Amino acid sequence: MNDSAAANEPTPLIHDGVLYLINTDNILQALDGRTGDLIWENHLRPPKNVPGGTGAMRNIAIYQDKIFAETTDAHLFGVNARTGQTVWDVMVGDSAKGYGSSSGPIVIRGKVIQGENGCDRYKAQEKDQGCFISAFDPATGKLLWRFNTIARAGE
């Protein structure tokens, strides 16, 4: 599943007899839970600027007919759980400014919630950047809200 030297720590997601996994090379897979046979594989995005990805990938989420996964370069994907086809892809944080992900999304009250790592690395001169948690519409990937976890000037 993973050819890179980065840590591979996915928490499997099992739904209706299918096992879903993601790895540090941003490859999302669906396996038959009984036989282990590969059902589909989606290469979401190649790891960006860092050989072998940017660290461990830990979890993905499912809601209705989609699997949700964030890649190591801070893109959030909605993927059709049955076919493995990408339905939507949104940039949550700019990886060029230090954002990335090692923990995936969760779904709460019909919203896909995603935090970022890299708050300690983002470029301080960028006034629009900071530490945040975001919520997205599971059907479209549209940003619903963003909450700054560290108050910025004026907040």
Q: Residues of each region from the PLM?
A:
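Short loop/turn segments that connect beta-strands within beta-propeller blades
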Residues: 32-35, 80-83, 138-140
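Extended catalytic-interface subdomain
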Residues: 134-155
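Extracytoplasmic beta-rich repeat domains
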Residues: 1-13, 41-64, 89-104, 148-155
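Short coil/turn segments that connect the beta-strands within blades of beta-propeller domains
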Residues: 16-18, 64-65, 109-111
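Short, conserved, GDST-rich strand-edge loop motifs in beta-rich repeat architectures
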Residues: 114-131
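Residue position within the beta-strands of beta-propeller blades
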Residues: 21, 69, 114-115
